[in-house]
């Protein structure tokens, strides 16, 4: 039984649980909900794809015959930065939803005329939303944070070595 239907004036697409479900079912934002193997595979494919995309530009800057190490280091650094931006977008989307799930009030607009209103969640809806936020969304945010940390650590060595070679 959906508790929102009976008690909630918030439009369906603006209800926190529906925002959570739409993120969970979207092509891009579902990445952290996948198993660790599938998630890491998607991140690795993204990293490799960005390597191929930045290669032509970097080949014009660092000829591979003359400066091979600079080319490979800069390729990895730029690809990692682009992947980090993608991960930051994932993090921001999920953090917005968890903020709305954990909040006792919901800001919404009925007509789209910037006449926002605030709805106070009843206790049973608040408990359900917080349960979803704590046990479903916070682990996803931690997964994204851990990925960002690992990627930034992996980028540190090539960034330092770039200036020595």
From Swiss-Prot:
Entry keyword set: Chloroplast, Plastid
Listed InterPro entries: CGLD27-like (IPR009631)
Any Pfam family matching the protein: CGLD27-like
Location relative to the cell: Plastid, Chloroplast
Principal location: plastid
GO CC terms, sorted: chloroplast
Family of the protein in this entry: Belongs to the ycf36 family.
Protein name: Uncharacterized protein ycf36
Source organism: Porphyra purpurea (Red seaweed)
Lineage of source species: Eukaryota, Rhodophyta, Bangiophyceae, Bangiales, Bangiaceae
